[in-house]
Design a protein with these regions (language model features):
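Hydrophobic alpha-helical transmembrane segments
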Residues: 15-20, 46, 66-70, 96-99, ...
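Hydrophobic alpha-helical transmembrane segments of multi-pass membrane transport proteins
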Residues: 19-34, 77-78, 96-111, 138-183, ...
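Hydrophobic/aromatic residues within transmembrane alpha-helices
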Residues: 35, 40, 59-62, 115, ...
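Transmembrane alpha-helical segments that form core, pore/gating elements
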Residues: 55-56, 74, 86-143, 157
Length: 232
């Protein structure tokens, strides 16, 4: 509704790419939120990071690149709840869904870079999100029915769509146009660290030594990966 992209004049291969990007985007979110129904948020986020870190490892060509990936992985593990992976309370289906979301995240990074280069501006993302919405709408209607059409639900859904999808995915698409996939994968490790800092500043949540060390590790990894990419 905010942007009216030009959707004609592109080769069929580019349109198929954008639709595939949208399908992966929808599957990633469905798998992740389904995992949240079964396992704690911290565990789900940690497991999902196998995706971007896997892309970073696959794209690494030097030992220094692997060092940044290892630092980011260590930081993410430090941010996971203590004992989260040692208990008997983890639902295997939830773990599997979180790992599946990570695989879709890896595909999202690769397809996002290709889509960003195949279309100008946000055109590719808009086509992808429309395709993703069309694919997920039947799932939502089957689970919630007419309740989805209530004014309160529509308003909340619009806010979530804007803040958790339209704005961040637009920014990520611009980043994917400019960065190698491996560097983007490492930079994604900043997300849980930034969340911890926001919790400290906005919500007054206390940061223990594990969280502080994790923030330092992922920040150093992000800076190191970015500088290495710029040097190349």
């Amino acid at each position: 509704l905010l942007w009216r992209p030009k959707v004609r004049g592109y080769p069929p291969s580019a349109c198929r790419l954008a639709v595939s990007f949208g399908a992966v985007l929808a599957a990633m979110n469905l798998a992740f939120y389904s995992a949240l129904d079964r396992i704690p948020l911290g565990v789900a986020v940690t497991l999902e990071f196998v995706g971007p870190l896997g892309v970073a490892v696959a794209g690494s060509r030097r030992m220094l690149d692997l060092l940044w990936v290892a630092m980011a992985a260590a930081g993410i593990l430090l941010l996971a709840p203590l004992g989260a992976f040692g208990g008997a309370g983890l639902d295997p289906a939830g773990v599997g869904l979180a790992l599946l979301a990570g695989c879709f995240w890896a595909a999202y990074i690769l397809l996002g870079g290709w889509t960003g280069r195949a279309f100008p501006g946000s055109t590719g993302l808009i086509i992808a999100m429309c395709a993703g919405a069309a694919l997920t709408a039947p799932v939502g209607l089957a689970s919630a029915g007419a309740g989805l059409l209530e004014a309160q639900v529509l308003l909340a859904g619009a806010a979530v769509a804007l803040l958790s999808s339209a704005v961040p995915y637009s920014l990520e698409l611009e980043a994917l146009r400019r960065l190698p996939a491996r560097v983007f994968g490492v930079l994604m490790s900043l997300e849980p660290a930034v969340a911890a800092l926001v919790g400290f500043v906005v919500l007054g949540e206390r940061l223990g030594w594990r969280a502080l060390l994790a923030v330092l590790l992922v920040t150093a990894a992000a800076v190191g990966a970015s500088r290495s990419s710029a040097a190349q």
